[in-house]
């Protein structure tokens, strides 16, 4: 049974039957509207965020399976502050603030996609992304929060989230 895999990025709940998805699906003999509706149903919870979607199609039976990944780190951070797009000038124009608990929650959601081996490393990675798109954390530049993590200021908070990190898939 030959299978074909299609990987695309869609806005949660808003996949469209146009190119490049529609023509690819119709070439494989699938009902484009049906597949797009199913993609929109399974990605609806990520409305407004870019979500990776993988469609595995059995060429002989025309059966397909849709797998939804975790939205991009940038999408999750922007959603957390209710912003539509990153700052065009992150060094001078800040677009929102998150607390470290929110960063830890996002790190746990992203664990399967992150190369970080520890929660602390994952949080530091997310802090770097937050800084690059104009988000402050705990009211400060994320670079300063990284220094405070290294100094042990957030050890209690990190310890509280370690169990969730260890239980998360990845």
From Swiss-Prot:
> One GO term of the cellular component aspect?
large ribosomal subunit
Its annotated function is as follows:
Forms part of the ribosomal stalk which helps the ribosome interact with GTP-bound translation factors.
| Entry's family note | Belongs to the universal ribosomal protein uL11 family.
Gene3D superfamilies to which the protein is assigned, alphabetical: Ribosomal protein L11, C-terminal domain (1.10.10.250), Ribosomal protein L11/L12, N-terminal domain (3.30.1550.10)
UniProt cross-references to SMART domains, sorted A to Z: RL11
MF terms from GO for this chain are:
large ribosomal subunit rRNA binding; structural constituent of ribosome
Name by which UniProt lists this protein? Large ribosomal subunit protein uL11
Q: Please give the HAMAP family that the UniProt record associates with this protein.
A: Ribosomal_uL11
Would the keyword Nucleotide-binding turn up in this protein's UniProt record? Answer: no
């Amino acid at each position: 049974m030959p299978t074909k895999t299609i990987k695309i990025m869609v806005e949660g709940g808003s996949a469209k039957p146009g190119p490049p998805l529609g023509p690819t699906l119709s070439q494989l003999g699938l009902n484009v509207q049906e597949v797009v509706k199913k993609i929109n149903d399974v990605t609806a919870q990520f409305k407004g965020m870019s979500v990776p979607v993988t469609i595995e199609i059995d060429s002989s039976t025309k059966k397909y399976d849709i797998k939804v990944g975790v939205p991009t780190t940038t999408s999750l951070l922007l959603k957390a502050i209710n912003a539509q797009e990153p700052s065009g000038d992150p060094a001078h124009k800040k677009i929102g603030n998150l607390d470290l608990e929110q960063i830890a929650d996002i790190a746990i959601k992203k664990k399967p996609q992150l190369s970080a081996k520890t929660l602390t490393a994952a949080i530091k990675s997310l802090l770097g992304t937050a800084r690059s798109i104009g988000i402050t954390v705990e009211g400060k530049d994320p670079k300063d929060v990284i220094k405070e993590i290294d100094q042990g200021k957030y050890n209690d908070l990190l310890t509280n989230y370690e169990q969730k990190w260890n239980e998360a898939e990845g």
